[in-house]
Amino acid sequence: MNRYVMFFLACLMGHVASAQTELRLSLSCPVSYEAAPVVVDLAPYGTVRSALVTVDGRETPCQLDDLDNDGQMDELSFVADMKPGQQRVANVKLMKTATPSEYKAQTYAEIVLRNQNVDKKNKHDIYLSAISIDKQTTNPYNVLHHHGVAFENEMIAMRIYMDKRQTIDLYGKFHKGLELRETQFYTSKEQKAQGYGDDILLVGNSFGLGALRGWNGVEPTMLDDVQHRTQRIVTQGPVRTIVEVEDAGWVIKAGTEPVNMTIRYTLYTGHRDMDVDVRFNRDISNERFSTGVVNVKNSSEINDGKGLRGCWGTDWPAADTANWKLETVGMGVYVPAKYLEHVLPATKENYGMVVKPIGKYIHYSLAYTSDNENFGYHSAKEWEGYMKEWKNRLENPVMVKKLSGGKAATPKQSKSTRSRR
């Protein structure tokens, strides 16, 4: 469920120096929206070192994030459950001093370098926050343990292959909880017996779950000609994790000028969906790209012809059928109308769509479920119902309005805005 709210508070007045800034926000939504994320842009408020958020008088976990690694906090995020037509009030205190509050982690991300001295596949111990691989590397897929950055919340977990496919591979959980630190995407027999999840999808050269590829007018194309491939962990904590994949010097088609592309994946606690934000270093409106989901063997397709596409199906997650069980998954992608060029006919490999940038930007959303979950969906009909509700939430975002009554740098002028989903 993509319940993402982006609220950027614009401060048109001069910043008043203070050790504390207080904001009062009104939250409302026309539809039911569990764990709706609210994001406050901290740029108008100077240095922020800690924060406290209450919703209707109850403290709620929040997270401060430095998104560009400049030592300054850029955004504050928290989530709130919303009922149709309900208005809730969030009080936000931003402080220049004090120790940040500690809340239980509900998201996690890791980039792990292979350690040749470690035998067990779930015990590698060289952790990175980012890595860049040069074009001269012939097989980047095998540089990293679990082949790329992995990230999760309590409901879902994924990894992104660090090669020309940049496929998103899926991990299915039986119970809610963070698992990747223990399993590293390679669950042992002992861990399986304890109820840990495992890899659930065979992706091959398909889109997997929503990989972004080129488009040559006939079929999707891989990211073959890239000067530098980078993966980084931007943040992780009690509210959200953000990871990025950067392709510097990508020659999309032979004879064209290279472009730099950064794909940001944002996953919030309480969600089985995530945002995908794609940014280029120049206007690329005339170019076309492709995305979609893998056509799982004997799957049922879900397609409204208007940007919502997915499937429900069952297949082996690996070629080794002796040591794996059949896995049933539901996957979905939603591309807003302004980024959708057209829906492609289903192929043996993919349910695809052609997408178009607006200037330097593309946005879409992804979701999935595993039939293993004791908290998820267990039939094609249930999954299709979820996807329709998911799209409805995306098209009816939470409204956030600044109320009077704040202190210090709080602007007198109110401003409401729709969420960026």
Predicted feature residues:
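Short, well-ordered beta-strand segments enriched in hydrophobic/aromatic residues
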Residues: L23-L27, M155, M274-R282
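Alpha-mannosidase-like glycoside hydrolase catalytic domains involved in N-glycan trimming
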Residues: Q20-K123, L128-A130, D134, T138-N139, ...
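Solvent-exposed beta-strand/loop surfaces of large extracellular or lumenal domains
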Residues: L52-L76, V251-T256, K297-W316, V335-Y339
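Solvent-exposed N-terminal domain segments of exported/luminal and surface proteins
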Residues: K96-D224
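Acidic (Asp/Glu-rich), glycine- and aromatic
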Residues: M261, R272-G305
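Extended, loop-rich substrate-binding clefts of extracytoplasmic carbohydrate-active enzymes
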Residues: A193-Y268
